[in-house]
Regions:
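Transmembrane beta-strands of outer-membrane beta-barrel pores
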Residues: 3-5, 19-25, 117-119, 128-132, ...
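Membrane-embedded beta-strand positions of outer-membrane beta-barrel proteins
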Residues: 15-17, 124, 200-202, 239
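Residues that define the transmembrane beta-barrel architecture of outer-membrane proteins
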Residues: 11, 105-109, 177, 181-186, ...
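C-terminal beta-signal and terminal closure region of outer-membrane beta-barrel proteins
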Residues: 40-66, 72-75, 153-155, 159, ...
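Repeated loop/turn-to-beta-strand initiation elements of outer-membrane beta-barrel proteins
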Residues: 9, 119-123, 198
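Extracytoplasmic gating/loop element in the C-terminal half of outer-membrane beta-barrel translocons
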Residues: 77, 127-205
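Conserved small-residue
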Residues: 4-103, 212
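Outer-membrane beta-barrel and related beta-rich outer-membrane complex signature
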Residues: 24-43, 131-156, 210-219
Length: 243
């Protein structure tokens, strides 16, 4: 949807908004309906051997996270190795894992605006993703207190290690499935028409991100954050000539 709130001789303001609602659900994984089919584990992660953190399961979204339900202490911190016995059999096994959120957003929103005043033009574009979750594999593979001090050396670890207080890895805990909704200011451009045939502009890209996600960047394609190279912030000075 595009609207022009102001349009005068020397001043024009245009606004554009688009909204997409996303929903997906797996309806069948076998040749014929089989309610007993457990699904297909996927989403390999770093740490351990053969660990998968996602599942394709009928009735659930694609690549849903498949994890243990973490139990927390009175101080709000997760208790190491303590999970909810969801099937009430008196022991914690893989049968106690459950489907917990998904990497795809519920809603994607795009917003752009452009203001022109005489020879000046200012434009900006923002994006928002709501309802998407990310498994923070960086944290799950580096937060262990037992690995912070080895061979008389202090090892590099993520700053969130003291919050979990885990001595050993808890790869399949839902503690590491984190809300990755975000708002990003993608681009701002300021342009000036020196003459009808000369235009100069300054552009800034990837300006800021607002999110509660604890990793580097919440925009992770497959929902598993594992050493993704962060996007750069760019500043561009340009000029265009029409002959």
């Amino acid at each position: 949807m595009n609207v022009v709130p102001i349009e005068k001789k020397d001043l024009r303001w245009e606004i554009g908004v688009n909204v997409a609602y996303n929903k997906n659900k797996i309806t069948r994984l076998t040749a014929s309906d089989d309610p007993s089919y457990p699904g297909v584990e996927t989403g390999g992660i770093s740490g351990g051997v053969g660990n998968n953190i996602q599942i394709q399961k009928v009735g659930n979204p694609i690549n849903s996270f498949y994890v243990f339900q973490q139990v927390y202490g009175e101080d709000g911190k997760p208790l190491e190795g303590v999970y909810v016995d969801r099937n009430h059999d008196g022991q914690i096994t893989d049968d106690d894992r459950y489907v917990y959120y998904k990497p795809d957003a519920d809603v994607n929103i795009g917003f752009n605006t452009e203001i022109s005043y005489k020879k000046w033009t200012l434009s900006a574009s923002l994006r928002s993703s709501l309802g998407n979750y990310v498994y923070n594999n960086i944290a799950s593979n580096t937060e262990m207190k037992a690995d912070m001090w080895t061979n008389n050396f202090i090892c590099n670890r993520v700053a969130t290690a003291p919050y979990s207080n885990f001595a050993q890895a808890q790869y399949k805990s839902d503690y590491y499935v984190q809300n990755a909704s975000y708002l990003k200011l993608d681009k701002v451009t300021l342009a000036y028409n020196i003459a009808p045939w000369v235009r100069v502009n300054f552009t800034a890209q990837n300006i800021f991100t607002i999110t509660n996600y604890k990793g580097v960047d919440p925009e992770v394609g497959n929902g598993i954050d594992n050493n993704m190279y962060p996007r750069s912030r760019n500043f561009i000075l340009g000029a265009s000539f029409n002959f």
